[in-house]
Amino acid sequence: MNTIPDSIETAAASGDLTAALAATVAHFGCQAGTIHLLRDGVLKLAAHKNIPPPVVQIIGTVPIGKGIAGLAAERREPVTICNLQTDTSGQVRPGAKATGMEGSLAVPMLADGELRGVLGIAKAEAYDWPEAETALVLAIAARLAPL
């Protein structure tokens, strides 16, 4: 069972996506994160932590199926990248590389099976996301989805 940490639960209970994102980033020892919400068929940036201003403009609107967040939304499953800077899979868009981050995880925010958005977190170093951590991030995303 994935127990959502108190700091994240408190922020979620208050409806504050920015605080919930900051608590999630801190809990996993990450340096950056985003929350995109599904609006009019595209993902719109709703909260971000430590994303450079030029990148915020690039990732403000993300089409479903494009980039890491768009792929997580399209597949409705986690997308992990060990190193954004050296990835050759074709999944990583220039905006993601411009963050300077390496280990990235994006998960869909689902409420009753319906896509509501995508939660993304990233570390400054290369990182293979363990299954248990990925499962907890999915649980956090599900908790945030109805907000």
Protein language model regions, located:
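Signal-transducing coupling segments at domain and membrane junctions
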Residues: 52-57, 82-103, 123
